Amino acid sequence: MEEDSQEDSNLPPKVWHSEMTVSVTGKPPSTVEEDGLPKETDVETIPEILETREPLSLPDVLRISAVLEDTTDQLSILNYIMPIQYEGRQSVCVKSREMNLEGKNLDKLPVASTVTKTPSPLITKERPSLPEIRQGGQFAVEFCKTQDLLFKKPARQTIMTTETLKKIQIDRQFFSDVIADTIEELQDSGTYNSLLQALSKERENKMHFYDVIAREEKGRKQIISLQKQLINVKKEWQFEVQSQNEYIANLKDQLQEMKAKSNLENRYMKTNTELQIAQTQRKCNRTEEVLLEEIEKLRMKTEEEARIHMDIEMFLRKQQQKLEERLEFWMEKYDKDTEMKQNELNALKATKASDLAHLQDLAKTIRECEQVIIEDRIEKEKSKNKIEQDLLELKSVIKLQAWWRGTMIRREIGGFKMPKDKVDSKDSKGKGKGKDKRRGKKK
């Protein structure tokens, strides 16, 4: 089948009818310019053709189905020849280097594609939808070629991480599903609306992805502007702190002056207080009575606070007990959930092992079928050579018989003799005798 596909790919462009060729151009456009306006992308949008099409003719359906089935086989083969994920050292330096290389490779991948049509002299105007069907198959083939080129690069140029391999597998499965649905729809109704719908949906997803990139770029610029504002605010705050420090120093100076003044005032007041001790003694007696009353009030208040403290302590102990019970409940639930997940993991491992055994059986069956096909071809080749040999021998026998019959007729061997005329002249008899003598000599 691979040889047939290679022979088909070597055909001149005139025999390809009107196929869709995908040309990859450039890197993904940046969504925001320096002035904040989005740039125009280089993606040439294909007009939406989602209205109901007339069913294709049976030869077109068979030809398109063959191409799509070949594409499906190539995608399935690609699934088996996918490389193993890159497993390097688990150090932090290696991981960071891997992330950087992955970002560079993703930037180099083509994301914008322009679709061009090649004129077809063999397709009439009654079948305008056939090139649109071939668009999907050709797009899948070009995608496979792109993936082959990526896989042929050395590991130092392209490091295929787990996320990249998962994305490639998802894209491959998506193409396989779309092509399978298209084949089923072609075989059922002779139309290809599911392919057009899938292309439209994928195009909408791509435009949504570009919008997300634009919003992200806008957010980055806003973050940069906010960082600049933060720097300005920090500068203003530092200036304000410096001014406040100067104000504090000034206040300290004033405090020193006030301390000096207070010392002078204390000296003056010392003499004044000695004169006022008697008056203050009377005031102290009255104040002592007031303080005793306040002490009684404080004692009662202290007892009340002690009682409240005991109530709060009891409440907190109850809450602690409840929390301990909840903690024990959650620990038991954690153990049960862990055991259940472990059982599920074991079941998944068993399923994986059974699937691997089934896959090995299928591979063994395929190898046996290939061996049977090769032996059948060898037997057919031997029978063909034998038939050709028999034909050659038959032709040789026929030629040999024809030569022998001609020789017998010319030399009159056996019952084959030349007819003679009854009325002959003497000259003719003499000539006849001369001929007989010649024939006798030849014999």
From Swiss-Prot:
GO MF terms held by the record:
calmodulin binding
Which cysteine pairs make disulfide bonds?
Answer: none
The UniProt entry's GO CC annotations, sorted and at most eight, read: cytoplasm; manchette; motile cilium; sperm flagellum
- According to the record, the residues making up region (Disordered) are 1-40, 415-443
Q: Which GO BP annotation is one of this protein's?
A: spermatid development
Q: Kindly state which keywords UniProt assigns to this record, in alphabetical order.
A: Calmodulin-binding, Cell projection, Cilium, Cytoplasm, Cytoskeleton, Differentiation, Flagellum, Spermatogenesis
Q: Which domain of life is it from?
A: Eukaryota
Q: Where is the composition biased (Basic and acidic residues)?
A: 415-430
What family is it from? Belongs to the DRC9 family.
* Quaternary structure (record): Component of the nexin-dynein regulatory complex (N-DRC). Interacts (via IQ domain) with CALM when calcium levels are low. Does not interact with CALM in the presence of Ca(2+). Interacts with the HSP70 proteins HSPA1L and HSPA8. May form a complex with CAMK4 and HSP70.
What does the UniProt entry state concerning the protein's domains?
The IQ domain mediates interaction with calmodulin when cellular Ca(2+) levels are low.
What is the name attached to this protein's record? Dynein regulatory complex protein 9
Q: What is the lineage of its organism?
A: Eukaryota, Metazoa, Chordata, Craniata, Vertebrata
Q: Which gene encodes it?
A: IQCG
